Amino acid sequence: MTSGQSKHEIRDMKFDVLVVGEGLAALTLLLHLPPSLKIGVISRNKYDEPSSYWAQGGISAVFSTDDDHDKHIRDTLLAGDGLCDEAAVRQIVCEGGDVLRWLIDQGVPFTREDGEIHLTREGGHSERRVAHVDDMTGRGIMRALQAKVAQLPNVIWIRQYEAVELLSDGQAVSGVIAESLADGEVTVFSAPTVVLAAGGLTGLYQYATNPHASKGEAIAMAWRAGATIENLEFVQFHPTAFQIEGRVISLITEAVRGEGGLLYNVANERFMPGYSSQQELAPRDVVARAIYSEMQAHGTSHVWLDITHQGTAFVEQHFPNLVEITRAHGCDLSQHRVPVSPAAHYTCGGIGADVAGRTNIEGLYAIGEVANCGLHGANRLASNSLLECVVMGKACAQSVTDTAGSASRLRLTLPERIETPFHPNLLADLRAILWNHAGIVRSNTGLEIGLQNMAQLQERHASVLPYGQALRAQNIFDAAHLVLLSAAARKESRGGHFNKDHADKAEAQTTQIPGVPVNFWAAGENASHAAQLAAA
């Protein structure tokens, strides 16, 4: 990718803190930052589109006398398969009760039974510890917090803009370049503190559980700003996506299996007892691979999930939204088995950060799914993600408050257009490459083919695109490439990464890809980007 000749000065807006993203981690951060800070939130979405909004199952927290922190920690470490940071796990788990109480205070209408918060159980959990809002927990939490954030006078929403590049010298950040999705106008937003809370990269897969999933843009931007990327090969595939004719209709929450749902293959055989002593409640990577194996063995596109034995009234009471969704597609969850198959659901790795979101770049923070703070390791325990979002958002706010500075107004001259090898169908190509070669089951040959396909995409005849459009293409390409590089570097199978040519575990190590500072807004250096990525 190289710069065009035409340059133009673009407008600039100045903030104390810039937040990229609008999910649960971002909202928690905003509610904990002091009102003295001028905060800008760059959001490409409407309120109902962040991944947090689509979370069905719930939020895990020790909130019962039958449970304790050590049990939750042990379950998390077991699911993480040797790659969790135990200190991070302990910190986040031990704040679970406080998190739940804080959310209640914010007006989150958790489902109750006999006056007490109803706790369900999900895969990998040894106790009932998942609080929920019916079967649409994310929506319930997000609506409550959105109402609170809307009252903050110091928060300026920059809607229908997509961040395309960080302003960084490889040591510190000074702002964000973003493109208007309405008219393509490019704007510099300057700030000494930038918080990335933009989600993961499951939108780069052909089948994903969130219809508006992020595509790794923030991960790519952070990497090009110099941030270290960790464990990006660990993409979690949710075992039970409700699919009709090859299209994902909805996630079927793990809580369905937690409340007694059973899995059957097309031969009407329960198969999970043959894969795990935990049966349907095994960790997600185990269940996803088991379903994949059954689909391969029988040549089918799905298996069956059945909870009809619990009775119509029970299912309608516990899963009203799922009953409505499945009923609308002629397959009522309360009365029939439903077809399910795995789909990309969560990015367990991400930008290397601590629990407060601090990265190796001064002023750059990463919180929520976009970050790798060490909680999830090689595989996320069900319903730990919403807990992580709140804990990281709160801790990040404290760190930002302690270190916040003042921004200098930036005047940049950008190329109006950039020469790029990418084309309008790039996303479809990337989704096919990752699904086929970095999916549920991987191989040395498949990963090699995937990397070759990526190289071929870079060798296509160059076109000239507007600056923002070219950078959006570069971001999704870089994110997909980083997944393949990370997966190829891990010569073992662990958690969400299964390579049939390296089926056993090796020594537990974190995969790290150091950041390669490359800025397309600066003159003269752009042509080196492809070579730097290939050498990463």
From Swiss-Prot:
Q: Which BP terms from GO are recorded?
A: NAD biosynthetic process
What cofactor(s) does the depicted protein rely on?
FAD
Write out the pathway annotation from the protein's UniProt entry: Cofactor biosynthesis; NAD(+) biosynthesis; iminoaspartate from L-aspartate (oxidase route): step 1/1
GO terms for molecular function, please?
L-aspartate oxidase activity; nucleotide binding
- Residue(s) at site: Important in orienting the L-aspartate substrate: E122
Catalytic function, reaction form: L-aspartate + O2 = iminosuccinate + H2O2
Q: Which residues bind FAD?
A: 22-25, 51-58, 369, 385-386
The answer to whether keyword Oxidoreductase applies is yes
Active site positions: R284
Top-level taxonomic group: Bacteria
Its annotated compartments are: Cytoplasm
GO CC, sorted alphabetically, is:
cytoplasm
The cross-references to SUPFAM superfamilies, in alphabetical order and at most eight, read: FAD/NAD(P)-binding domain, Succinate dehydrogenase/fumarate reductase flavoprotein C-terminal domain, Succinate dehydrogenase/fumarate reductase flavoprotein, catalytic domain
**Which Pfam families would you find in this protein's record?**
FAD_binding_2 (PF00890), Succ_DH_flav_C (PF02910)
Can you quote the record's cofactor note? Binds 1 FAD per subunit.
The family assignment reads: Belongs to the FAD-dependent oxidoreductase 2 family. NadB subfamily.
Q: What does this protein do?
A: Catalyzes the oxidation of L-aspartate to iminoaspartate, the first step in the de novo biosynthesis of NAD(+).
Question: What protein is this chain from?
Answer: L-aspartate oxidase 2
Q: Give the organism, scientific name.
A: Ralstonia nicotianae (strain ATCC BAA-1114 / GMI1000) (Ralstonia solanacearum)
